[in-house]
């Protein structure tokens, strides 16, 4: 419904535009082109933190995940207004290792540091929690690679 209303509005705007982009009154939209007020609210239940974590761990633990799905998952996860739990990052790092994608491991760790923002205690905590996984998988942190000085 909203998409149709927006399309009608966009079509109406382009049909009224003259050759130089100026509006003229040669053709005014009829009542069908009026924008309708639509409320875009979710009617579903809220996802708990545990369900959110489980969903992302399951996503990254898929045995047949490919490089595109990995990057898509990382990009989506980074857009959230939160620092992912270490167990989600652990699953993502293991997926990177399965795909031999070292660059993505560094990118994930840099994104976690960036998402922590001014809260300087978060990133060291995450690295501390991930240290066994980092050692097991042979992954160096951006600081160990000297990327924090670049």
Curated annotation (Swiss-Prot):
The modification Phosphothreonine is found at residue 141. Residues 1-41 form a transit peptide. It is found in: Mitochondrion inner membrane. In response to mitochondrial stress, the precursor protein is ubiquitinated by the SIFI complex in the cytoplasm before mitochondrial import, leading to its degradation. Within the SIFI complex, UBR4 initiates ubiquitin chain that are further elongated or branched by KCMF1. Disulfide bonds: none annotated. The modification N6-acetyllysine is found at residues 87, 113. The keyword Kinase does not apply. It holds the Pfam family COX5A. One of its GO terms (molecular function) is metal ion binding. Component of the cytochrome c oxidase, the last enzyme in the mitochondrial electron transport chain which drives oxidative phosphorylation. The respiratory chain contains 3 multisubunit complexes succinate dehydrogenase (complex II, CII), ubiquinol-cytochrome c oxidoreductase (cytochrome b-c1 complex, complex III, CIII) and cytochrome c oxidase (complex IV, CIV), that cooperate to transfer electrons derived from NADH and succinate to molecular oxygen, creating an electrochemical gradient over the inner membrane that drives transmembrane transport and the ATP synthase. This is Cytochrome c oxidase subunit 5A, mitochondrial. It comes from Pan paniscus.
